[in-house]
């Protein structure tokens, strides 16, 4: 459904994927790439960096990277310990380490928050987004009621204003 909506608006996106989901849904992962979107690493099991031992966290990133093979990395919950960054750079191959790009966001839709409506999520995005914004949506069970209607409305709103939606890459 998400890919259909993106296609309808000629929008490209970057999907930060959880390795375990890539393993379970290989066809979807391949379709994302085939349709011209970019992918990034979001660990293997969506570990919370500040609550996970450094060696376990690094292993999760490396395990996910074996499947995802992207220099783009977004720490789950946007948090990572300095020791984990240092260890990642040390434990990845020299080429992977040089290319590793940590990606944050400028606007989060809060689509996963069950106390919010799609309208609340939409209003949060348009209140905070502008040129060059990186907007986060979640394609997860928690976000199922908010994500699709919010994404659709955001794409309609900004497309009508002349904005385009681009994927992230190594050069961004």
What is the predicted function of each stretch?
Residues 17-20, 41-43, 75-77, 106, ...:
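A cross-domain feature marking catalytic cores of carbohydrate-active enzymes
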Residues 79, 84-128, 162-172:
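His/Asp/Glu-enriched short active-site or ligand-binding loop at hydrolase and phosphoryl-transfer sites
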Residues 1-70, 164:
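Active-site beta->alpha N-cap acidic-glycine motif
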Residues 16-25, 47-55, 74-82, 110-116, ...:
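Acidic-and-aromatic substrate-binding clefts and catalytic sites of carbohydrate-active enzymes
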Residues 4-13, 21-24, 143-172:
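C-terminal domain-boundary segment and adjacent tail
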Residues 4, 27-34, 59, 63-66, ...:
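Alpha-helical scaffolding segments of alpha/beta enzyme cores, especially the outer helices
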């Amino acid at each position: 459904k998400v890919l259909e909506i993106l296609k309808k608006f000629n929008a490209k996106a970057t999907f930060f994927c959880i390795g375990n989901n890539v393993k379970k849904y290989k066809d979807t992962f391949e379709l994302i790439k085939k349709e011209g979107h970019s992918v990034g690493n979001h660990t293997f099991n969506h570990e919370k960096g500040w609550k996970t031992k450094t060696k376990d966290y690094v292993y999760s990133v490396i395990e996910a990277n074996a499947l995802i093979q992207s220099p783009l990395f977004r720490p789950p919950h946007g948090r990572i310990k300095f020791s984990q960054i240092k260890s990642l750079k040390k434990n990845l191959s020299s080429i992977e380490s040089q290319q590793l790009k940590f990606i944050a966001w400028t606007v989060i839709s809060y689509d996963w928050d069950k106390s919010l409506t799609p309208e609340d999520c939409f209003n949060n995005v348009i209140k905070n987004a502008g040129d060059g914004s990186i907007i986060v949506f979640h394609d997860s069970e928690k976000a199922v009621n908010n994500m699709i209607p919010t994404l659709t409305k955001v794409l309609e709103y900004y497309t009508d204003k002349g904005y385009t939606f681009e994927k992230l890459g190594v050069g961004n």
